[in-house]
From Swiss-Prot:
Heterodimer of GatD and GatE. InterPro entries: AsnA_fam (IPR006033), Asp/glu_Ase-like_sf (IPR036152), Asparaginase/glutaminase-like (IPR006034), Asparaginase/glutaminase_AS2 (IPR027475), Asparaginase_C (IPR040919), GatD (IPR011878), GatD_N (IPR040918), GatD_N_sf (IPR037222). This is Glutamyl-tRNA(Gln) amidotransferase subunit D. It catalyses: L-glutamyl-tRNA(Gln) + L-glutamine + ATP + H2O = L-glutaminyl-tRNA(Gln) + L-glutamate + ADP + phosphate + H(+). The active site is at residues 102, 178-179, 257. GO terms for molecular function: asparaginase activity; ATP binding; glutaminyl-tRNA synthase (glutamine-hydrolyzing) activity. It comes from Saccharolobus solfataricus (strain ATCC 35092 / DSM 1617 / JCM 11322 / P2). The gene is gatD.
Length: 444
């Protein structure tokens, strides 16, 4: 199979009966390069794409190649011999639900490309150590990029979690893309109450075809958490540092992705992580004694009203533009990420007053992320309070947004909406901050 190659490169492969997925060796002068031939999607028809043993993909120009030869045909590789024991027919303890992302992807030996592991057997093949921890079962709910996540998908995930608990599983692992994983964690936390066990969201910052991949450690740590954690909460389980020593378990309504690419991108904000996972020792160590205990029966209440928006205040926010948004008849609620203790320009206060009188909920969070809103300190804050803006304590803006979607789907009366938004339902509000909750960056 050479259909992804064209021109001169195609002719060379055809003459040597080399196909994509074959192990080949290329000689250019004194340099010998060995790897798996991958599909080429380059417009240049004089390039071979090779996956090296170290996991990296490289392109090699056919110019000045002195020799190219097949080493091993893909069809001769007995991949079945790599399969490990799977608990077929046995009742699973941990359900792994895949929604997309790279966390449960694996290298496809036929081509060297990466694709999702679709079955329990493939996950065990990808990470056989799971068998040492628990009997697992896997389900692909859907496979989407996390930026395409929507409230209706949150409902489907919540329903699948409820079903998995009803089937007798004691813990759930949800594979998810990292970019919007914190949103989904919040949505599930409000949708699923009295959890019978941990619901662990896990993702990967580096795909499994890269030497620095965090996929295996994160997934293994998530299964350890789902198996041994004493809490019945929705959590996020991710790498804790740049090395591979341990992972951290973050409360789902107190976590945020704080770096675009680092493996330890996820951090607890205004709260301590619930636990750390020593994956080599297969051990979970609790770090936070304040957690929601497991209950006897999981309650499902998953519905959302997405007629909301998140307003990130900035100097110069146009009043007319804001007025157009506030007078949109579809809007039922607004979360403001305000400055400092919870402020916007005083120019906008009367617009907010009119909106709240019209029944629109307006909640205030802080752009600072760390710390809490206090609108009683300065004049502008007090004026915003008088205009009907509701301070939302130390809630993260994204968590407040998801919570508002959930609350609006359950209540119509503004006063009841306000009361629910300031009620600590699942740990989204931390009433007491200690000095150690704020990270200190060292430049020494």
């Amino acid at each position: 199979m050479q259909e992804n190659y064209k021109g001169k490169a195609y002719d060379i492969l055809k003459n040597l009966n080399i196909e994509e997925g074959d192990l080949i060796e290329i000689k250019k002068g004194d340099l010998r390069i060995r790897g798996i031939l991958l599909p080429s999607y380059s417009k240049d028809d004089r390039i071979f794409v090779i996956k090296l043993d170290n996991g990296y993909n490289i392109g090699i120009s056919i110019d000045n190649i002195t020799e190219i030869k097949p080493i091993e045909k893909k069809s001769s590789k007995d991949r079945e011999s790599e399969r490990r024991e799977v608990h077929n027919g046995a009742k699973s303890e941990i359900k792994i639900i895949s929604t997309g992302g790279t966390i449960v992807s694996r290298v496809e030996y036929e081509t060297g490309a990466v694709r999702p592991a679709l079955t329990t057997e493939e996950i065990i093949q990808f990470l056989p150590e799971i068998n040492e921890i628990a009997k697992v079962d896997a389900e692909v709910l859907f496979s989407i990029l996390s930026e395409n996540m929507k409230p209706e998908f949150w409902v489907k995930i919540a329903e699948s979690v409820k079903k998995a608990f009803d089937e007798g599983n004691t813990g759930i692992v949800i594979a998810h893309g990292t970019d919007t994983m914190a949103y989904t964690a919040s949505a599930l936390a409000f949708s699923l109450r009295s959890l019978q066990g941990p619901v662990v969201l896990v993702g990967s910052q580096r795909s499994s075809d890269r030497p620095s991949s965090d996929s295996a450690i994160n997934l293994l740590s998530a299964v350890i958490t789902a198996k041994y954690a004493p809490f019945g909460e929705v959590v996020v389980n991710m790498h804790a540092e740049s090395s591979d020593t341990y992972a951290l378990v973050h409360r789902g309504v107190k976590v945020r992705k704080m770096h675009s690419s680092r493996r330890d991108a996820f951090q607890s904000v205004n709260d301590k992580p619930l636990a750390k996972v020593l994956w080599k020792e297969r051990k979970l160590v609790m770090l936070n004694e304040k957690y929601i205990s497991k209950k006897d029966e999981t309650l499902l209440d998953a519905k959302f009203d997405n007629r909301v928006f998140l307003l990130y205040y900035y100097p110069g926010l146009d009043r007319d533009f804001l007025e157009q948004m506030l007078t949109n008849t579809k809007i039922r609620g607004i979360i403001i990420a305000g400055t400092g203790l919870g402020h916007t320009s005083s120019d906008h206060i009367e617009l907010f007053r009119k909106a709240t009188k019209d029944g629109i909920f307006i909640g205030m969070t802080t752009q600072c992320l760390f710390g809490r809103v206090n609108m009683n300190v300065y004049t502008t804050g007090r004026q915003l309070l008088d205009a009907g803006v509701t301070p939302l304590e130390d809630m993260l803006p994204e968590v407040a947004l998801v919570k508002l979607m959930w609350v609006l789907a359950h209540e119509q009366d503004l006063e009841k909406i306000q009361n629910l938004m300031i009620t600590n339902l699942v740990g989204e509000i931390n009433p007491r901050h200690t000095l150690d909750l704020f990270p200190r960056w060292s430049y020494e």
